[in-house]
Amino acid sequence: ELIVVEAGRIAVALDGRDLGSLGNRRTPFEGPGDALYLPPGAEASLRAEGEGARLVRAAAPPPDGPGPDRPGPDRPGPEQMGLVPRVIRPADQRIAEVGRENWRRQVRTILGPEHEALRLLAGETLNPPGNWSSYPPHKHDVDAPPLESRLEEVYLFRVDPPGGFGVQVRYHGDVDGESDRSATVVVDGDVAAIPSGYHPVVAAPGYTLYYLWVMAGVGRAMHPHLDSRHAWVDDPGDGGRPGGAVTSSDRAGR
């Protein structure tokens, strides 16, 4: 599981051993924060230091029983992987400005494929007012590496100022044809489950939109599949014209 300190400070003890304090921000809009990764079987004691401490716990069940998720020669369990609890500071995270124009946003990868973990992938995205993210639209609901990897995802939203909102868009197939499509208003504290489909997000003008994203699947490779009809917007060499589709999955950001 992954514990992200959203605000304030918490004292952490692991198996009776004091790990010190986690937390370096008053809100997630201030910048990247501290996190704690706990592999299956690890237990930690957490205690708030003062008022205003707020944390988020994200977890995925360890592979168990028959089926493709079960540990085996091709998929070791936490003991075989040598996974240990660890503190993740802002300096350990990959922070990048992704996109351009009104789909530019900051992405903070807390737990990426390059970090040792059993199932989880996680990070934070910060949309400036009026800007889009998870754009060009992408999905990850089919296991077809290296073109796409199957990962379920959850978003936890925060809005600054908190009275604002954003919009979570979801669609399958052709957005202008007969397909499953929706647009949902999200406010501060909302959670959105994304089991499948393309899922871009936009912040309302005047409000900064933050979301913690957490993914889990059989594997931990991130191969998002871009909607090729809209991928051209991220290709500066195409002159900003539709029709010059970019399909490389590694171009997608959160």
Where are the language model's segments positioned?
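A short glycine-rich, His/Asp/Glu-containing loop-to-beta-strand
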Residues: 101-154
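A short secondary-structure junction signal
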Residues: 67, 80-88, 120-123, 131-140, ...
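Double-stranded beta-helix
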Residues: 52-109, 205, 212-254
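Conserved metal-binding segment of the jelly-roll/cupin
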Residues: 29-49, 60, 185-206
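An anionic, turn-rich surface loop/hairpin at beta-sheet edges
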Residues: 23-29
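Glycine- and acidic-residue-biased ligand/ion/polar-headgroup-sensing regions
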Residues: 1-20, 33, 129, 141-190, ...
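Short, structured patches in soluble enzyme cores that scaffold and shape functional sites
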Residues: 48-50, 57-62, 109-111, 123-129, ...
